Structure formats: structure tokens, C-alpha cells
């Protein structure tokens, strides 16, 4: 079992965790419907880059 030789100081602990922070997801606004969705993903209405690409339940 691995055991540390010396206690890690708060500064070193912070340096170790420096890459663990979460970033905000990249959001985009669909130009036709105005809905917010993840970039490079289809909006909830089935639109992608201004074109209808899939049928949804609300379609007639």
C-alpha cells in the first residue's frame, strides 16, 4: 500500500487540484427558435444550424 513520505502543504495541495475546476458548458442559441442548447448538438426542437433534422413528438 502506498503511503506518503511527508504531509503535503496546502499550497502543494492546491497546485495538485488546479486542473480539477469545472468550466461552464459552451452554450449556443438556435437562430430559428431562439432556444439555448449545447454547441454542436441538436436543440430540443430538433433543429441544428437552422434546419430541422429530426422529428419530435410536438411535430404535426
Swiss-Prot record:
GO terms for molecular function: structural constituent of ribosome. InterPro entries: Ribosomal_bL32, Ribosomal_bL32_bact, Ribosomal_zn-bd. GO terms for biological process: translation. GO terms for cellular component: large ribosomal subunit. Residues 1-43 are annotated as: Disordered. Keywords: Ribonucleoprotein, Ribosomal protein. Pfam families: Ribosomal_L32p. The keyword Ribosomal protein applies. The keyword Ribosomal protein applies. Belongs to the bacterial ribosomal protein bL32 family. This is Large ribosomal subunit protein bL32. It comes from Nitrosomonas europaea (strain ATCC 19718 / CIP 103999 / KCTC 2705 / NBRC 14298).
Amino acid at each position: 500500500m502506498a503511503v506518503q513520505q511527508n504531509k503535503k502543504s496546502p499550497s502543494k495541495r492546491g497546485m495538485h487540484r488546479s486542473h480539477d475546476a469545472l468550466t461552464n458548458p459552451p452554450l449556443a442559441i438556435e437562430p430559428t427558435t431562439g432556444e439555448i442548447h449545447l454547441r454542436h448538438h441538436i436543440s430540443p426542437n430538433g433543429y441544428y444550424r437552422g434546419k430541422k433534422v429530426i422529428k419530435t413528438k410536438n411535430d404535426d
